[in-house]
Structure formats: structure tokens, C-alpha cells
């Protein structure tokens, strides 16, 4: 009973929710054996044909390459690509690739030489003697990737599994309509496929190995059973035909009954899955020593005259393959890379075949029907019933259309396998898969931007922390430098402290002076004299330095004298040519004269009432008289040059002249009656008289040269003459006094 139950358990399969049964259309291409395609003239090899970053170029334009020669270096998750044939690298430039967006990617363009020469191949027939790491590294460097459609690097996938893998699943379901590449590969190369499975099992050491294949491939099932007849370590499980039973999560559940958690991987539950084509590529890489340079591609559709499966070199233009199969395009011909549900339409036929290309479908106009116009969602829930991932496609559609990224993420849009079952059953002809692809791309872009922002923030915070640490260290250094003086400063401080202590000690000592003795201050006096001598020497040195710095250059002195003379001449010319900007107002002059008379009367009263304690100094009186004469001459000139706006009163002028004569006589009498204590210097008096005569002559010349604009007032002339007579009389008296 237990054996029967174990056998039942061993062969048990599970069924997943949802799924559809579209027309298979596989008989068009699975009836003919694999065949080779003639080499194309030009090959375009994109550097990135897998999930992850592109490798580093190791060839340049003009290089000769052989088939299997690496074009890039694979480091980390970067997978290298290899030359599909021998030839010459003619260009390394962007080129449109096999992608729904048809964006250009960096590619190596090779012109084939037709010889198709291989690099030296080193196969490991005894791979069981190799370590796990060596096998994984060889698989990675030979460019093996998942050929089922994902394109994930096989070496990285094997390395990530580690020792946790208990079940190795080989996906041979190939559930999508039209595609028969794996079916034909298993029919023609079953032994090589099984050998590749054994290499994977040797690396992973799983507890069980399962091959899942749909029951619509009877020839492939027969070939595998024949190869596995003597093997007990590999189990072949035939499953019902249902789309998409070939999905990784769906096939895992069908064969093991285990579900991959949301956001997780199959390795989390101890399962690792590889494709049939990947197993065959592993065999060729390890045992034959051949990098992946070709793969099986299905050429099908009613627009192709000879449908079938071919060995297509990577980098071969799609146009070359279709033309070799008898392509008969219509007016609006469509070519799909992949199947009708998960594939995408090519914008043109010059894109190259890559590692994930498994089918080229060229349907006729009647084969797929006319494209239907998209209509509004009626919420019929047919898409939810057909979804194999147990999602709500109608809700995801609304979230994607409304740019509600958070809600779309909450409803597990990342679990969508883009199988197209929802779009197939939609009565409104809504291309749901396109909406979901766009939404996932936008979410990925947002997360990438958030990641960049987080990295930038981390870098900024690290920089700020570094600056704060440097600032704290700098302040600490400054603080330490301020607290701890330098060596020479320490010596100076110690010397100063020693002097202070010595003085304090001397101050505390009692001074004892014996009777009859004087204190000996010779040392102090000598020190004082030394300081004085030092100060004098320093002063003399400073004086010499200043004298040396201020020695006049003869040329410089001459230049300065010339400049002084020029300035003097310029000043004389300005004074001679200057025209009075403002005329003297007679009324203002009269007011000033009245003020002067009042001050003179006040001074006379003070002198009359005062008792002279001291005699008047004749020299001081002479100076005051000279100042008075100068002021009088200045006033006369201003009055002579002024244009009288109003007539002067004759009586007032006569009064002013009389007052002036009285003041002059009084001042002449004071020096005459004074007893001089000291004799006036005759030479000084002569000089003053000469200066007065020179000024008088100058005044006469100015008056003679002046152009009288108006007639001179006779009364004013009389006043001026009286003043001149008084001045002359005073000068004569002064001369007599000097002679006595």
C-alpha cells in the first residue's frame, strides 16, 4: 500500500487556476527536421542580449575574429557575447535590436568571410572531475543564458541556487501557439539535451530531477523516454496542454504543488528551473567547448512558404532568415518575434536574432483576423477568471490607466507574467498586457530614481559627517596648539618666570646698610648707562636709516623746483586774469565801516580810562598799523572796482573820512609819545617801508591799467587821497623815530 501511495505521489500533478486553450497551430513547423541556414553577409551582435548590464568590449574596428571568439568580457553578472562566424569587425555602433521599443543599442557589426572558422575548442568530456565553481565559470564565460525567453545568465542562476536546491525542473512544456523550437530540438537532439541535464544536476546536486512536457508533443516524449529508459534519476512528467502551463510559477506548481511567494523566487522553496534549449547549450559549452553562437528558431506563419525550425546564428538579420524560408509578404505584412500572445511586432526586418529569439511568425491577413477597436471595460471578470497568477486584471487596468502606481503595486502587478490570457478573453479588445508592461516600466523608473535619490542623500550625509569630523579635528588641533606653547615659547616663558622669581627673592631679602657706609649702586648705574647707550645707538641707527632713505636725488630736486615755479606762475596768472565774481555791495561796506568805528570808539574809551601800567610796544604798534593800512587798501580796491548800485551819501562819506583821519592821527601820536623800552630795528623798518612802497606802486599800476567802466566818484577819490596822505605822514614820522 505504501509503495502504491509513493508511486501515486511521485507521478501526481497539480492544476493551476485560470488558463486558456487557444488554437495550437504547431503542426505548421514541427514536422520537418532542423536545418542549417546559409551564412548572411553581415551580422549584428548586440552587446546586451540578457538581463543585466552589457559586457566590456574587447575588440575594435578592423579586428579579424573567429567563430566563438569573445567580443566582450563578462564580469560579475555581465554576460559575454561571441562572434557567430569568422570575419572582420567593420563597425561598433548603435543598432536597433529585438525589443518592443526597437531602441538602438550598442552592437558589433561583422562582415563574414565565408570560411566560418572556429577558435580552438577545448571540451571537458570528463566534466565530473571538475569542481562546481569551474563548471559554473565555464558556463558563464561561454555566454549561456536562459533560452526560454527571459535571458537570465545561467551561471549566475546556478551560483545563486547554492545548496538550497532540492528539485531541478526542466521546462519542456512550450505552451504558446505556433512555437515548436523546443519540440523539434527534443526530437532531433534528445541525447544531448539529457546530457546537459546531467551536467546541471552534477552542479546543483538536487534530490529530484523533473522534466515537464505537454501531452501535445508525442514524438518528443517518445525520444526522451527512449533516452531515459535506463535512468532512474530523471523523471519525465507529461502534463495536460493548457496555456500558460510553461510559465515558471505555473509549471512549478503543476509538478511540485508548491507556490512561489509574492515577490520571491523559486529558489526560496528549493526549486530551480531551466529550459530545454538551455540544457542543450550547457552540454555544448562544457563537453564540446563551444560558446553559444546559434540557437533553434521557429519560422512559421502562412506568409512563409517553407515553415520549420532552423539553426540561426546569433546576429543574423531577420530578413535573411525569412527570405531563406520563402517569405511572401503582403501589402501590410506583420512579422512577430515570439508567439502570438507574448511576442511583439517588429518595426522593420533588419533587427538581428538574439539569444531570446525562439520564433518568427509571419501570419497572413486572414490568419490573425482584422485588428479590433478597443472599447470600454464592461467589468465582466473574464480576465480575472483566465489569469493564471490569480490577479485582478481589470483593477490593474484602471490603476495603470490612472497612473495610480501605489495601488497597482499593492495589487501585485509585479506578479503578472504577461502571458496575454486576459487580453485573449477580453470581449472589449483591450490590450491589457501593453498597459501592464508600461505600468511596470514606470514603476521601475520611479524606483530607480528613488534609489538614486537615496544614494545621493547617503553621499551628502556622509560628506557632511566627514566635514563635521574634519572641523572638530581642526578645532581640537587649534585648541591643543593654544594650550600647549611651542618649544621656544616654553623657553621664553621659563626664563621670564625665573626672572620674576629672582626679583621676588631679592625683594624679600632685607637690605642692611652699615653705619657710615654708602650703598653700592654701581651695578644699577652701569646697567642704566648701558640701556641708555643701547637706546642712543638704536636711535642713531634709525636716524641713519631715515637719512639714507630720504637722500635727495639732484634730478628729483630739480624737477620739484621746476614744478613749484610752474605752480607759482600759474597762481599769478589766475590772480591777474581773475575777474571779480561778485561786486562789493556799498551798503555792506558802509555797515562794516560803522562796526569798525564803534569798535575804535570802544577801544579809545578803554585806553582813556585805563591806567597804563606798561608802555606800548612800538613794534607791536607798527605791526597793527601795517595791518590797518592793508585792510584799508583792500577796502579801497573793493570800493573802486564795485559798480555802485546806489549813490553814496556825501555827508556820510565826509564823516567816515574825518573819523579815519582822527584814528590815524591818534595812532601816530601813541608811538611818538611812547617811551620805547627797546629800539626798533632800522633794517626791519626799512624793509617794511619798501614793502609798503612796492604795494603802493602795484596798486597804482592796477588802477592805471584798469578800464574804468564808470566815472570815479570825486568824494571817494578825496577819501582815498586823505588816507594816502595820512599813511605817508605816518611813515615819515616812523622814519624820524628810527633815525633818533
UniProtKB/Swiss-Prot annotation:
InterPro entries for this protein: 4Fe4S_Fe-S-bd, 4Fe4S_Fe_S_CS, Ion_transpt_RnfC/RsxC, Nuo51_FMN-bd, Nuo51_FMN-bd_sf, RnfC_N, Soluble_ligand-bd
A biological-process GO annotation: electron transport chain
Membrane topology of this protein: Peripheral membrane protein
Entry keyword annotation includes Translocase: yes
Cofactors required: [4Fe-4S] cluster
One function term, GO molecular function aspect: electron transfer activity
Family statement drawn from the similarity comment of this UniProt entry: Belongs to the 4Fe4S bacterial-type ferredoxin family. RnfC subfamily.
Main localization category: membrane
Keywords of the record: 4Fe-4S, Cell inner membrane, Cell membrane, Electron transport, Iron, Iron-sulfur, Membrane, Metal-binding, Repeat, Translocase, Transport
Protein name in the entry: Ion-translocating oxidoreductase complex subunit C
Comment on bound cofactor: Binds 2 [4Fe-4S] clusters per subunit.
Biased composition (Low complexity): 573-583, 637-647
Listed EC numbers: 7.-.-.-
Binding site for [4Fe-4S] cluster 1: 377, 380, 383, 426
Residues noted as binding [4Fe-4S] cluster 2 in the record, renumbered to the chain: 387, 416, 419, 422
Entry GO CC: oxidoreductase complex; plasma membrane protein complex
Subunit and interaction comment: The complex is composed of six subunits: RsxA, RsxB, RsxC, RsxD, RsxE and RsxG.
Subcellular location, record wording: Cell inner membrane
Free-text function comment from the UniProt entry: Part of a membrane-bound complex that couples electron transfer with translocation of ions across the membrane. Required to maintain the reduced state of SoxR. Probably transfers electron from NAD(P)H to SoxR.
Residues of the 4Fe-4S ferredoxin-type domain: 369-397, 407-436
Enzyme class label: translocase
Region of interest (Disordered), ranges: 571-590, 602-716
Keyword Manganese among record annotations: no
Gene3D superfamilies for the chain: 3.30.70.20, NADH-ubiquinone oxidoreductase 51kDa subunit
Amino acid at each position: 500500500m505504501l509503495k502504491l501511495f509513493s508511486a501515486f505521489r511521485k507521478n501526481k500533478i497539480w492544476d493551476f487556476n485560470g488558463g486558456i486553450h487557444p488554437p495550437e497551430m504547431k503542426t505548421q513547423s514541427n514536422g520537418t527536421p532542423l536545418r542549417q541556414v546559409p551564412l548572411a553577409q553581415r551580422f549584428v551582435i548586440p552587446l546586451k542580449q540578457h538581463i543585466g548590464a552589457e559586457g566590456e568590449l574587447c575588440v575594435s574596428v578592423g579586428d579579424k575574429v573567429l567563430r566563438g571568439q569573445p567580443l566582450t568580457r563578462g564580469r560579475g553578472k555581465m554576460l559575454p557575447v561571441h562572434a557567430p562566424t569568422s570575419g572582420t569587425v567593420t563597425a561598433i555602433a548603435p543598432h536597433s535590436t529585438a525589443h518592443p521599443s526597437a531602441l538602438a543599442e550598442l552592437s558589433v557589426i561583422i562582415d563574414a568571410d565565408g570560411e566560418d572558422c572556429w577558435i580552438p575548442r577545448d571540451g571537458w568530456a570528463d566534466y565530473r572531475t571538475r569542481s562546481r565553481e569551474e563548471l559554473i565559470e565555464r558556463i558563464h564565460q561561454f555566454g549561456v543564458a536562459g533560452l526560454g525567453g527571459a535571458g537570465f545568465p545561467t551561471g549566475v542562476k546556478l551560483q545563486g541556487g547554492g545548496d538550497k536546491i532540492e528539485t531541478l525542473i526542466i521546462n519542456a512544456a512550450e505552451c504558446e501557439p505556433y512555437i515548436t523550437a523546443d519540440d523539434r530540438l527534443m526530437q532531433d537532439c534528445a541525447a544531448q539535451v539529457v546530457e546537459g541535464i546531467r551536467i546541471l544536476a552534477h552542479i546543483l546536486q538536487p534530490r529530484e530531477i523533473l522534466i515537464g512536457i505537454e501531452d501535445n508533443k508525442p514524438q518528443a516524449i517518445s525520444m526522451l523516454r527512449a533516452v531515459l529508459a535506463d535512468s532512474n534519476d530523471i523523471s519525465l512528467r507529461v502534463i495536460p496542454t493548457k496555456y500558460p502551463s510553461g510559465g515558471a510559477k505555473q509549471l512549478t506548481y503543476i509538478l511540485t504543488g508548491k507556490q512561489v511567494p509574492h515577490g520571491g523566487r523559486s529558489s526560496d522553496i528549493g526549486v530551480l528551473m531551466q529550459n530545454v534549449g538551455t540544457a542543450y547549450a550547457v552540454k555544448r559549452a562544457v563537453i564540446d567547448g563551444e560558446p553559444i553562437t546559434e540557437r533553434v528558431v521557429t519560422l512559421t506563419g502562412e506568409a512563409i512558404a517553407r515553415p520549420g525550425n532552423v539553426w540561426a546564428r546569433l546576429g543574423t538579420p531577420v530578413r535573411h532568415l525569412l527570405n531563406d524560408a520563402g517569405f511572401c509578404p503582403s501589402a501590410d505584412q506583420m512579422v512577430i518575434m515570439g508567439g502570438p500572445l507574448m511576442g511583439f511586432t517588429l518595426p522593420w526586418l533588419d533587427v538581428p536574432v538574439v539569444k531570446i529569439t525562439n520564433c518568427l511568425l509571419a501570419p497572413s491577413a486572414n490568419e490573425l483576423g482584422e485588428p479590433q477597436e478597443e472599447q470600454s471595460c464592461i467589468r465582466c471578470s473574464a480576465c480575472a477568471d483566465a489569469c493564471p497568477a490569480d490577479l485582478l486584471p481589470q483593477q490593474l487596468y484602471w490603476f495603470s490607466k490612472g497612473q495610480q502606481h501605489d495601488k497597482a503595486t499593492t495589487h501585485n502587478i509585479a506578479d503578472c507574467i504577461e502571458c496575454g490570457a486576459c487580453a485573449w478573453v477580453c470581449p472589449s479588445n483591450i490590450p491589457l498586457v501593453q498597459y501592464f508592461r508600461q505600468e511596470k516600466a514606470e514603476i521601475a523608473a520611479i524606483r530607480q530614481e528613488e534609489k538614486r535619490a537615496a544614494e545621493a542623500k547617503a553621499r551628502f550625509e556622509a560628506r557632511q559627517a566627514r566635514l563635521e569630523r574634519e572641523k572638530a579635528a581642526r578645532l581640537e588641533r587649534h585648541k591643543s596648539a593654544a594650550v600647549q606653547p611651542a618649544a621656544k615659547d616654553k623657553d621664553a616663558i621659563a626664563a621670564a618666570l625665573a626672572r620674576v622669581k629672582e626679583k621676588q627673592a631679592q625683594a624679600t631679602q632685607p637690605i642692611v646698610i652699615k653705619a657710615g657706609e654708602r650703598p653700592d649702586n654701581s651695578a644699577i648705574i652701569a646697567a642704566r648707562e648701558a640701556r641708555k647707550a643701547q637706546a642712543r645707538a638704536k636711535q642713531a641707527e634709525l636716524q641713519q636709516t631715515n637719512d639714507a632713505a630720504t637722500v635727495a636725488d639732484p634730478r628729483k630736486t630739480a624737477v620739484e623746483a621746476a614744478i613749484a615755479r610752474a605752480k607759482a606762475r600759474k597762481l599769478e596768472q589766475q590772480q591777474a586774469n581773475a575777474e571779480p565774481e561778485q561786486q562789493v555791495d556799498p551798503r555792506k561796506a558802509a555797515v562794516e565801516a560803522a562796526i569798525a568805528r564803534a569798535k575804535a570808539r570802544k577801544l579809545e574809551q578803554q585806553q582813556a580810562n585805563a591806567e597804563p601800567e606798561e608802555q606800548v610796544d612800538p613794534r607791536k604798534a607798527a605791526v597793527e598799523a601795517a595791518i590797518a593800512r592793508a585792510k584799508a587798501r583792500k577796502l579801497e580796491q573793493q570800493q573802486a572796482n564795485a559798480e555802485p548800485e546806489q549813490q553814496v551819501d556825501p555827508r556820510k562819506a565826509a564823516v567816515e573820512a574825518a573819523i579815519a583821519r582822527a584814528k590815524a592821527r591818534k595812532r601816530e601820536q601813541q608811538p611818538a609819545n611812547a617811551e620805547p623800552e627797546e629800539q626798533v630795528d632800522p633794517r626791519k623798518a626799512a624793509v617794511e617801508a619798501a614793502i609798503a612802497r612796492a604795494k603802493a606802486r602795484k596798486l597804482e599800476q592796477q588802477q592805471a591799467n584798469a578800464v574804468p567802466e564808470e566815472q570815479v566818484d570825486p568824494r571817494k577819490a578825496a577819501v582815498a587821497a586823505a588816507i594816502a596822505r595820512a599813511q605817508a605822514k605816518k611813515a615819515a614820522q616812523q622814519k624820524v623815530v628810527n633815525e633818533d
